[in-house]
Amino acid sequence: MPARMHYTVLEPSSTERVAIRGLEYNVRRWGPADAPKVFLLHGWMDTSATFQFVVDALRHDWQLIAPDWRGYGETTWLHRPYWFPDYYADLEALLAHYAPAGPVRLVGHSMGANIAGIYAGLRPQRVARLAMLDFIGLKAPADVDAPQQLGRWLDAQL
C-alpha cells in the first residue's frame, strides 16, 4: 500500500462575500494586499480552493484572488438553468469590484480558462496577461457577428 501523502497549507485563504449581479459570491484571497493582483478562475466541478498549491508557491509576490463561480462552492446557487455568458458578466463585475482601473492578470483552469479567454477577446483592454490551463476551446460560431453580439450583451449588463 502506498504511503499517504500529507500536504501542509502554507497560507490559508481569507474569504469574503461580495454582491455580484444579484448573487452572493464567495471569494478567497491570499498574499499581500499591496502586491500586484492575479485572478485565479477555477474549472468545472471545482472551487477556488483548488488553487491552494499554486498559492503557496506565489503568495509572497502576488495578491491572489479566486472566486467560486455561480453554482460552485460557497457562492449562491441558482434554482434555474445556468447560462454560460453570465460567467463573463460575473467576471466583469468581479474585476470592477477588485480592480476597477487598468488591465488585470487572469489565470484560468478548464471552464475558468474558457471564461477568461472569451472575456479577454471581448475586453482586450482589461487583460494584461492571460494563462489558460487544461481547456477545450469553444466551437467557432456560425454567425460571424457573434463576438460583437456578445460584447453588446456584456455592455448592457453594466
Range-by-range predicted roles:
Residues 43-46, 90, 133-134:
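Conserved acidic functional residues
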Residues 55-58, 81-84, 123-124, 146-150:
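Glycine-rich, phosphate-binding/catalytic loops in enzymes
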Residues 1-38, 59-63, 99-102, 128, ...:
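Alpha/beta-hydrolase fold catalytic core
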Residues 117-122, 128-158:
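Flexible "cap/lid" loop of the alpha/beta hydrolase fold
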Residues 46, 71, 113, 137-138:
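Active-site micro-motifs of SAM-dependent methyltransferase domains
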Residues 26-77:
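Conserved HGGG/HGGXW glycine-rich cap/lid loop of the alpha/beta-hydrolase fold
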Residues 18-28, 66-111, 115:
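Active-site loop/oxyanion-hole signature of alpha/beta-hydrolase fold enzymes
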Residues 55, 95, 119-120:
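A conserved amphipathic alpha-helix that caps or lines the catalytic cleft of carbohydrate-
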